[in-house]
């Protein structure tokens, strides 16, 4: 375990006196040019021990004193204690002085004294500038805040509604009518654990409502024609006074300190923040609010910012109301950094952010995609504090000094950081967006380019909701700190740029994002995500650069964004996103365009998260295979009219009852299967998947594999069985479901059939011979093993899952029936079918003949699948278990589950290997080939966004063939793989083997 040592920055000065130790926060100060005498400098001196107030107050004889100024004595320092007993050092322009009109920096030496005794001296630099940092950040952030509904409670109040609320607040001394949450502190409750008291109801329901009303009034104060900056002065004054009253009344009744709540006469906790973060333990607060604190902080941002210039000016004028409100806001916003008790367990690997003491594998507290949500309030805090050096929080467990004893002495709740001044603190949090995941079931960015957030059951694919915000919301912070002393370093920009360039465009086809990895946004407008959200992120990143920011490939990103904006973006390739068991196979750069993708899941991963009232995405991840040519085959409208029991690629019982509604967004759970994986060499790809659902709604099990050839996809299935009783319906493999807008043609048993849009068809055709289906630009070829029943459904024959969102646009479904009890009926308990893009119905007979002549495929002993294309000279093997398979004249025998692709060209072999059952511990994968390959040690570089040095594949002669030993990434190699070896264990490993002697060419 790596021990983390907290290192003080230059402006954190340890002050020692006897047994007492003080850490001084004096990082940044500025004042405007032309400031007259007595003008307060922005930025105050603070002590870390201020966090212990009000329970432990700073000694009353502490004071600050300027010992020396480089220039004439331009400033003086005053010592001030607030109502909680916290000490501050306040600089002012000295009497008879002015800062002048020239920008410069004044340096001085300051002492912290206890009476007449000097405890420590420290340097201070005061910047005299035309615009203070506070003014600059305020100018930048207020418009941004007004553009985000959450920061004013998403309340766009009419002027009439605002007038009514002003009257309510004025009459109620700051209180809105109809709320019971305005109770004096401490709040007192009786609680018996064995018998929950029904009178103890969540307090946050009303708090959130009050926050949102205040937020709406704050927005009106900024933007209303009557109450806004250009509105009626008297009306505006009335709203301002009402906001002061409403904020004071509300913030003063929300418990923050541990003794603000008494349970059975005892304080609920002993730390700042406990007053709110522990309420859930007693049924007094909803857990989601406890962990999503921005629900209570965000709505007050706009009203607080709108009033802040007046509040700070009021403080300068010794206005008691302004001072009380400011102190109440600082107290209230401590809830934002309060953490629920369970998540404070720093050495518990099961808690939200893992074992925080293991800094090699955990990035600490808040290491998840909710940092995008948190950043909204974070960026407001320096402006609300009106100070640069007051720490971002007084919640004590965020400080290294909180951890006194070995082995956790000097531990940091977030590695490498302890609060030391809000401006520096928030700047630092803007660097915590690109957090890597080190293991399955951990939030973070994966080496394959995907990202996970909700990991309660397994690794998820959150490429739109949560993940995209985690990647890009930092641009607000980059812009906020642009060209300041707190600007963000270039590598943090580069992290985002690399993924905007190298990852996301590959998921876009014809202006549409792939719904299979969109997370909870799967049913949103994913065309808008591409044309607006993504393109805005590119522009925001470019605009957020400081003058000294250095980025690679920015011009390339801008060129790609331009092509996307004109809906002209095309690319070709096959990529495996192996951590999330997802693969994309597409063409379009120089070929007829199409896009195919495959999503699997396993005991390591989950499918599509679903927060819908009517569950739909239950089967997402169960071997789902989609093929797009036009680009809108699975858009928002198609998905809204879908039977979600019949996703393309799925093998399952075709039920017609509602999908389970209970159990949360990931109730579909990970699979119970170990074997699932994807493999790609850049041109070709494959997937292997043992369908073995853990949840009890699904009824089937199967061994499934997928083979992505140049312009065809072959899907094989075997060992299809009933796993559970289910609903008693037949088990099917669904070939496709999409909008029924073109003639649907199918040829089976020597007969041609057609259905036209608007026609409702329910056809079941038995056949023992190859058949084909066609619609639009896509064709399907089905190759029976013995006897199949081809199912065609269109129009009203489709059981739409959610009629509330359906618009009546009909879909079609093509499926293969395996019977109620596969293997026990006169229907195949296996399947083989192809999907072919860019084909007409007239061309399908020719394609069928070409397939029969070109492809050799087998399912050996049900547990090994393989295919050989004579035309493309590629062999692909899927081993669900140890065994051997001969295909295309080459036998491969594997000692473990594996994926193997062997592509032969005139001058070289391309060998690709994947481990579909990664555990991070397996050291080698070994197999034998009857075809002899040139012997040698061939180094490989694992695939991914950022390439790392890999290991090697050893090929040695074995009889007339070869023995191949693949050195896998494993736990011994943790540091080599940046402590992500568990994730790299499933990475596609690709080498090129020259047929002639000479140097080896490595695939990059």
Model features per residue range: what roles?
Residues 7-14:
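Bacterial N-terminal signal peptides
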Residues 35-39, 58, 81-85, 100-104, ...:
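Solvent-exposed loop and beta-edge segments used for protein-protein assembly and interaction
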Residues 136-146, 155-522:
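Aromatic-lined, polymer-binding surfaces characteristic
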Residues 470, 477-939, 943-958, 971-989, ...:
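Extended polysaccharide-engagement surfaces of secreted carbohydrate-active enzymes
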